[in-house]
Amino acid sequence: MEGLLKLSTLVIVCMLVTAPMASEAAISCGAVTGSLGQCYNYLTRGGFIPRGCCSGVQRLNSLARTTRDRQQACRCIQGAARALGSRLNAGRAARLPGACRVRISYPISARTNCNTVR
């Protein structure tokens, strides 16, 4: 019986310790790429920026509330950029937040160290 009480106490302590971490779950790459999906043609071919693209950039900015979210969004953006390879115009990607009237604290670049994003 004493062993069961210790086990129950340990389980409760673990739940209390990990609960704050679960509530700070980072944004998913699916949410990032979903938000930026309408930007694809602009980022690869140029032309005008679709209204839906800027809406997605603004939505992503509002979803990335915590440092952890912003770091994860940075990693997801870099992963998507790597997948696009030479089709991605890095200059357009770097200018996109400003063109959509969104201020972010880090440059959109393959060289950005996402661990330093706050």
UniProtKB/Swiss-Prot annotation:
<feature type="disulfide bond">
    <location>
        <begin position="39"/>
        <end position="53"/>
    </location>
</feature>
<keyword id="KW-1015">Disulfide bond</keyword>
<comment type="similarity">
    <text>Belongs to the plant LTP family.</text>
</comment>
<dbReference type="GO" id="GO:0006869">
    <property type="term" value="P:lipid transport"/>
</dbReference>
<feature type="disulfide bond">
    <location>
        <begin position="29"/>
        <end position="76"/>
    </location>
</feature>
<protein>
    <recommendedName>
        <fullName>Non-specific lipid-transfer protein 5</fullName>
    </recommendedName>
</protein>
<dbReference type="GO" id="GO:0009506">
    <property type="term" value="C:plasmodesma"/>
</dbReference>
<dbReference type="InterPro" id="IPR036312">
    <property type="entry name" value="Bifun_inhib/LTP/seed_sf"/>
</dbReference>
<keyword id="KW-0732">Signal</keyword>
<keyword id="KW-0446">Lipid-binding</keyword>
<dbReference type="InterPro" id="IPR016140">
    <property type="entry name" value="Bifunc_inhib/LTP/seed_store"/>
</dbReference>
<dbReference type="GO" id="GO:0008289">
    <property type="term" value="F:lipid binding"/>
</dbReference>
<feature type="signal peptide">
    <location>
        <begin position="1"/>
        <end position="25"/>
    </location>
</feature>
<feature type="disulfide bond">
    <location>
        <begin position="74"/>
        <end position="114"/>
    </location>
</feature>
<dbReference type="InterPro" id="IPR000528">
    <property type="entry name" value="Plant_nsLTP"/>
</dbReference>
<dbReference type="GO" id="GO:0005829">
    <property type="term" value="C:cytosol"/>
</dbReference>
<feature type="disulfide bond">
    <location>
        <begin position="54"/>
        <end position="100"/>
    </location>
</feature>
<keyword id="KW-0813">Transport</keyword>
<dbReference type="Pfam" id="PF00234">
    <property type="entry name" value="Tryp_alpha_amyl"/>
</dbReference>
<comment type="function">
    <text>Plant non-specific lipid-transfer proteins transfer phospholipids as well as galactolipids across membranes. May play a role in wax or cutin deposition in the cell walls of expanding epidermal cells and certain secretory tissues.</text>
</comment>
